[in-house]
Amino acid sequence: MVNVIDYMPGDTLLHRLNPVVKLGLAAAIIVGIFLSDTYVALLGFLALTLALGAYAGVVDRLFSLLKLLIPLALIMLVLQLAFMRDGNVVWGFITDTGLITGSKACLRLLGVALPLILMLMVTKLNDLANACVEVLHVPYRYAFTFTTALRFVPVFGQEMNAIMEAQTARGVEYDTKNPIKKLKLMLPLCVPLLISSVGKTDATALAAEQRGFYLRTCASSYKRYPIKGLDIAVLIVSIALIAIGFLF
C-alpha cells in the first residue's frame, strides 16, 4: 500500500526547488488561506494546490486525501450550523451566518491540509532535514526528529493493518458500520501498537547513537542546498500569495 506522503520521483520544477523554499511555499499558501475571507480566494488557493499537484504528477494522491477529509469537513459544517445562532434564520435552526462561517471553515480545513502534504510528496525526507540544517540552521536533532516521525507514519500504518488482519483471522469483524462498536474494537489494538512503536523508537535511537548522531553538524552532509534564481522567484510568489490572502 502506497502511503500518501511517500516521495514521488519526478523532474518537474517543483521537484527541483530547494526543500526549504518548498516549505516556504506551502506555508505561504496556508497563511494565505487563514487570512482569506472570501470564497473566491479560498477556492483559488485550493485550486492552486491541486494544480501544483497535477503538475508534479501527484494529484491522484491529493484527491484520495481530499476524500478522507471531506467527512471531517462536513462534521465541522454541521457543528457550525448547530451552534452558530447569529444571523437570519434560513431554514429550521440554520442561519445564514452559520452557513457562511461553516462553509468557509470547511474550505479552510481542506485547503490547509493539502499544501504541506504536497511538498512532502515531492521532497525526499533526507533532503528536507539536511536543507533545514544548512539553510535555516535548525539543530540536526530537531530536523532528524521531525523527518523520523514522518517515516514512522507508514510503518505504524502497516503495523496496525497486520494486527487487524491477525484479529480478523480470529473472527473479529472490523467492517461494522456502527462507529461506536468499531471504536470499541479498535481501542484494544492501541496497546500492541504502542509496545511495537516503543521498541522501534528505542532501536532507532540506539542505531543513531552508534553512528555518531551527536557528532553530526551542518557540514556533515556531502550534498549542498544553495538558493538559486528559481528559488528566489518562488519566494517572491509566496510573499505575493500571503498579500493576496491579506487583501481578499
Q: Each PLM stretch: what is its role?
A:
Residues 1-41, 45-48, 162-248:
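Transmembrane alpha-helix interface motif
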